[in-house]
């Protein structure tokens, strides 16, 4: 499955429907055969039956954005497409070919059609509601919603008014600038400003008249200035063939018969931008496009050969679409990147530009499948041949083959088969294989070197700070999803922090360790903390000097015999028992060592058999026997 893609100005334009994408299938073909056909089973069909037997004339979308209405031949009929179902809703045949139509309701149920036989057909949900005729052949029509007037432009200097509320024709508007002496003179196009309802009529004489619908009077007339350059292939008469107001109420685009597009501000009589299509063909369609991706205001201008999209303020080209058939009408779906066209040829076309706007909601899958379905360039016949000049052919020693079927002359050289070229090159230059081998080895070595992990150039000053900042940046980028962006290490404002020694951070200072305790080492005790620790360790412990003073006081009150007995007892205890603990003073504080005394396990105390704590054997005396055999225990 593949899509045709164009890449003008590095902007991808996908053809999602039309010539080469949607294939017409005969009615008699079997569905079983379709399953075996890879191309047909993997084709894309954005809208079912999006085609006409011969050609399509006009196409428009409804205001609710759910339907599209198109007219075409042959036989003349109307088609309505349902976007939600992506298929044809219905088709309705008419008596004459359509010139222009207008959708009156928000959906497709009410519409008015101007036909080539001067008839005006009103269509409702059930069919043709009413049909009437105008005196001259019509060229365009517009519906004015506030007063229910239908304006019909035709040949001559009159614009007919048909009031749909009263159901009758009103006095027509007299357009003085229209050329009534010319057989083709008249009013070509009509447009109504969506903001203040100002009427604009483009004439065949190359002028635009502005009318106020409230009092039906002309406000002003705009003549095409002579300073606007014309193409050398255009005639002297330049007529207005397209008109389009912008939604802001101030800007209007005017398309001329020689392929020029002029942008005007209603407050000025001179254009602030002009653009030429380049084909000297009349402009058939103009549209204002606002991009939701970059917010740029653009203009779409189309003639029968090409569709151009360019910026409103600068005229810079954005993209262009050049279909294989002639265009009749263009309908971009508002707020999206999808463009529908009515054209000569059976299939109507649909183009999708992802960089302009996203896909419509009813075909949002286009955003995902366009790149996957993009067609791969097919190899051409020249891929198997090598182009060489006559001098290169002499160096290879193949000049004697000129004129044979092996070498084919082309422009200033020759086409030669690739295999023959390689063999001749090896014979003419035996060392070419060794050069080729060295080249391959060099490329592989460079590829391996590129794949190795290279050490990053760490700054000489504050290397630790730089590594921590880069780690935090990478962590933040993974969290936010932003892969590219300016790094703080490359910021000119903080450049001196990583290059100048004056900004170096000393991580060994006490202040830095207090601010970063997780990276600082364990510090020593202060003098106050050491004194408090000594008090805690020495609390409750009697030193040898205290014991001696107490013993001296006791010795004064004891008799000699009692003192001798007590000394003997202390000596025996000191000989039998080693000291349990030793306390000594060190520069870092008090230190105490002790030994845990091992105690012998005490033997269990023998208990009397009659005690209630336990019995060695069961006592059966005085108890009732469970068996009737009284001699069992005898």
UniProtKB/Swiss-Prot annotation:
Residues 571-588, 619-634 have a biased composition (Polar residues). Transmembrane segments: none annotated. It comes from the Eukaryota. One of its GO terms (biological process) is maturation of SSU-rRNA from tricistronic rRNA transcript (SSU-rRNA, 5.8S rRNA, LSU-rRNA). Residues 546-559 have a biased composition (Acidic residues). Residues 513-522 have a biased composition (Basic and acidic residues). WD repeats lie at residues 51-91, 182-221, 235-274, 278-320. It is found in: Nucleus, Nucleolus. Belongs to the WD repeat NOL10/ENP2 family. Component of the 90S pre-ribosomes. This is Ribosome biogenesis protein enp2 homolog. It comes from Schizosaccharomyces pombe (strain 972 / ATCC 24843) (Fission yeast). The gene is enp2.
């Amino acid at each position: 499955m593949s899509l045709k893609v164009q890449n003008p100005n590095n902007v991808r334009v996908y053809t999602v429907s039309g010539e080469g994408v949607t294939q017409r299938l005969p009615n008699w073909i079997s569905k079983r055969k379709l399953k075996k056909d890879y191309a047909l089973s993997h084709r894309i069909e954005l809208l079912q039956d999006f085609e006409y037997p011969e050609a399509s004339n006009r196409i428009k979308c409804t205001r609710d954005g759910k339907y599209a209405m198109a007219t075409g031949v042959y036989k003349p009929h109307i088609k309505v497409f349902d976007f939600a179902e992506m298929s044809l809703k219905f088709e309705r045949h008419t008596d004459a070919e359509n010139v222009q139509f207008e959708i009156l309701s928000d959906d497709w149920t009410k519409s008015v059609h101007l036909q080539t036989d001067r008839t005006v057909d009103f269509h409702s949900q059930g069919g043709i509601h009413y049909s009437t005729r105008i005196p001259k052949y019509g060229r365009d029509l517009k519906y004015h919603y506030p007063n229910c007037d239908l304006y019909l432009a035709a040949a001559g200097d009159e614009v007919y008014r048909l009031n749909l509320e009263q159901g009758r024709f009103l006095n027509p508007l007299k357009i003085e600038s229209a050329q009534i002496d010319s057989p083709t003179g008249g009013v070509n196009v009509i447009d109504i400003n969506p903001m203040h309802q100002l009427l604009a009529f483009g004439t065949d004489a190359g002028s635009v008249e502005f009318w106020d619908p409230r009092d039906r009077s002309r406000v002003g007339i705009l003549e095409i200035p002579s300073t606007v350059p014309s193409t050398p292939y255009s005639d002297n008469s330049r007529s207005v063939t397209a008109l389009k107001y912008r939604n802001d109420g101030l800007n209007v685009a005017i398309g001329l018969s020689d392929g020029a597009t002029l942008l005007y501000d209603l407050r000025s009589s001179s254009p602030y931008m002009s653009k030429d299509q380049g084909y000297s063909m009349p402009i058939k369609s103009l549209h204002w496009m606002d991009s939701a991706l970059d917010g740029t205001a653009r203009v779409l201008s189309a003639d029968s050969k090409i569709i151009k999209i360019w910026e409103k303020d600068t005229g810079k080209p954005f993209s262009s679409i050049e279909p294989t058939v002639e265009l009749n009408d263009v309908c971009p779906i508002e707020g999206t990147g999808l463009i529908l066209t009515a054209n000569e040829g059976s299939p109507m076309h649909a183009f999708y530009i992802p960089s302009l706007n996203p896909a419509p909601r009813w075909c949002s899958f286009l955003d995902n499948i366009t790149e996957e379905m993009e067609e791969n360039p097919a190899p051409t016949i020249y891929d198997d041949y090598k182009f060489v000049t006559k001098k290169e052919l002499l160096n290879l020693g193949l000049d004697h083959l000129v004129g044979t079927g092996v070498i084919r002359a082309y422009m200033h050289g020759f086409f030669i088969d690739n295999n023959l070229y390689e063999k001749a090159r090896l014979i003419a230059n035996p060392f070419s294989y060794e050069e080729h081998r060295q080249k391959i080895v060099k490329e592989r070595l460079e590829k391996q070197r590129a794949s190795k992990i290279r050490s990053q150039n760490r700054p000489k000053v504050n290397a630790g700070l730089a590594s921590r900042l880069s780690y935090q940046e990478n962590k933040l980028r993974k969290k936010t999803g932003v892969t590219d962006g300016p790094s703080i290490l490359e910021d000119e404002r903080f450049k001196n922090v990583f290059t100048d020694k004056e900004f170096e951070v000393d991580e060994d200072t006490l202040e830095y360790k207090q601010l970063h305790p997780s990276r600082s080492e364990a510090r020593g005790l202060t003098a106050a903390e050491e004194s408090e620790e000594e008090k805690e360790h020495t609390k409750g412990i009697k030193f040898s000097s205290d014991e001696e003073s107490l013993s001296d006081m006791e010795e004064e009150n004891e008799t000699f015999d009692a003192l001798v007995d007590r000394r003997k007892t202390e000596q025996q205890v000191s000989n039998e028992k080693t000291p349990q603990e030793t306390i000594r003073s060190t520069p870092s504080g008090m230190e105490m060592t002790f030994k845990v005394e091992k105690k012998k396990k005490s033997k269990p105390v023998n208990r009397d058999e009659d005690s209630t704590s336990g019995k060695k054997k069961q006592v059966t005396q005085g108890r009732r026997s469970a068996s009737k055999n009284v001699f069992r225990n005898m």
